[in-house]
């Protein structure tokens, strides 16, 4: 079972342009791949404005600019791992509403599809996937496209 803490902290956005809790939960469910996630799983999705995402991006990644999504994976303390009592929390996703909307418009993508992509992308990061080198990026993008296709969305990496 997935326990999703869904937070909307962005104040100057049209709530009609934000995904619902139910949509996010559906996207999270299909993006969780790891065998260890068979039981209870907890994560947070926090929708923020540009100021908050820029501050987090600067403080945690050294990049003083906005971004679409930040992933903060949770690592169980070694003492809990040793005891076999790992917590089900996998981490936090922080997604900037304005950046997602701007990207969807600029890339001529349906807003809902881009939100789905950002949630799935972030969930894959929480599970250890990355796109630092080309091989990792190819694998991650292919998996994102496959998951999105299963949900009925076009690949975010193919242009019309």
From Swiss-Prot:
Amino-acid positions noted as binding Zn(2+) in the UniProt annotation, renumbered to this chain: 121, 125, 131
Entry's cofactor comment: Binds 1 zinc ion.
Entries under Pfam families matching the protein: YbeY
Keyword Protein biosynthesis: no
GO cellular component assignments: cytoplasm
Record GO terms (molecular function): metalloendopeptidase activity; RNA endonuclease activity; zinc ion binding
Highest taxon of the lineage: Bacteria
Protein family: Belongs to the endoribonuclease YbeY family.
Protein name: Endoribonuclease YbeY
Annotated organism of origin: Hydrogenovibrio crunogenus (strain DSM 25203 / XCL-2) (Thiomicrospira crunogena)
Gene designation: ybeY
